Regions:
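Secretory/organelle targeting and membrane-embedding segments
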Residues: 1-202
């Protein structure tokens, strides 16, 4: 909740372009394609209160999404990768976004003041979908040093490999009382990569 979480970042990056979906993308863009449905659903999974029963998940998710504060223009960044206008089915003067970043807040006691960031784009440096929950810095420095970012975090890699990781500061070796950032990876599931909708259905 807001007492411990500084921000939540949800990223869906793809290293490839629109491929043969140029005409489709001209009608949708990144926001309508993945942000307003897939990434918002992931945000709901992270932020909703635990449902009392399995069948009340949808109700809790809808309640949380209704609490999202209306997003203003200054909280959205849109971009288009170089070469998109040369893709088959794409207008030569297209202004459709292939990258979008959105910041929003949830109007609830639990999440008041905590920014949620959604990012998605094509033709980026890597392909990965992950959730990064940044924790608030502790009130005092354990190692007697100025607390610097990043503080502790929890990272969920949703694809293509499934990984859960925790980022912390650990004491460096030796007598010196100072810390260094390390990442603990308690769970890592690698193997057959499922297509996105196959993973959803299974």
């Amino acid at each position: 909740n807001r007492n411990y979480v500084r921000s939540v970042q949800i990223t869906m990056a793809e290293s490839f372009g629109v491929r043969s979906r140029g005409a489709f993308y001209e009608q949708t863009g990144t926001i309508r394609d993945v942000v307003q449905n897939h990434l918002l659903q992931v945000a709901a999974c992270i932020a909703l209160d635990a449902p009392a029963r399995g069948d009340s998940y949808r109700e809790q998710s809808a309640r949380l999404l209704r609490a999202v504060v209306p997003i203003d223009r200054d909280s959205v960044v849109r971009g288009q990768y170089r070469g998109y206008r040369n893709e088959p089915g794409v207008a030569p003067d297209s202004r459709v976004e292939t990258f979008a970043a959105v910041r929003f807040f949830i109007d609830s006691w639990r999440w008041a003041g905590v920014p949620f960031y959604l990012r998605a784009g094509k033709a980026l440096a890597t392909t990965a979908t992950e959730v990064w929950v940044a924790m608030r810095c502790p009130p005092r420095a354990v190692f007697g040093e100025r607390i610097v970012d990043p503080c502790n975090y929890v990272r969920f890699r949703l694809g293509p490999d499934v990984t859960t990781a925790i980022g912390i500061r650990s004491k460096v070796l030796g007598e010196r009382m100072s810390g260094e950032p390390i990442e603990l990876v308690p769970t890592s599931r690698r193997g057959t990569r499922l297509r996105p909708y196959t993973r959803l259905l299974e």
